[in-house]
Amino acid sequence: QIKLIAKDLPKVKTWIQIEDGKAELVDFAHSYNDIITKSSAMPRIERNENNTLMIYTGGTTGMPKGVMYTHGSFVVSIFGGLKAQGHKVPDVRDRENIEQLRPIIIEMSRTNSLSRCLIACPLMHGTGMFLGGFMTHNLGGAIITVPKVGLDPLLLLNQVKSSKATSMVIVGDAFAKPILEELDNAKSKNNPHDI
């Protein structure tokens, strides 16, 4: 299908194809696997933990504003997620301890206990981006999304079961109440969700 539209996209200078074993490499594309194989790792860039990320939010007032977070505070909160799951986590505010996290994540992988997080809220929302995406990925886990725009509690609960999600990220009552209503409705019909 890319061949059909490529001529209509003259500003695209480089095409990279990720092989999925089903289609041959398009003649004008580069193989992603070849690029990765031929590339070498970039040197590690040390970042200052006080570097700031700003996201925009309406918050509780509905008025847009910027909220600033430091990278260091994110590292602490991300690994706090491991502690909440019952793992013994070193104090990561001491940079020397961060390397101690690697064996924890390797053990989680070995025991098939890495997080599988269903992100129910938008990824553009701080909760979806940070708690759902960044935290899960930084701990070696997988994120799960649904292929439909909008909040559909039945779809979410079915996705939890079919994708074997271990957690779901939501934002407040706007998500919790409809999901709880669906759980209650299913239970009242003697057909509770098996999650």
Regions found by a protein language model. Give the residues of each.
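Active-site segment of SDR-like NAD(P)-dependent oxidoreductases
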Residues: 58-61, 124
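ANL superfamily adenylate-forming
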Residues: 2-51, 63, 72-75, 181-186
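Adenylate-forming
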Residues: 1-5, 20-23, 121, 165-195
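Conserved pre-ATP/AMP-binding loop-to-beta segment of ANL
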Residues: 38-56, 63, 89, 107-117
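Conserved AMP-binding/adenylation subdomain of ANL enzymes
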Residues: 77-119, 124-169, 181-182, 186
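Short aromatic/basic micro-patch
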Residues: 29-30, 68, 169
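A short helix->loop->beta-strand "cap" motif at the edges of active sites that frequently abuts
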Residues: 9-15, 141, 192-195
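Short beta->alpha linker loops
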Residues: 49, 73, 151, 171-174
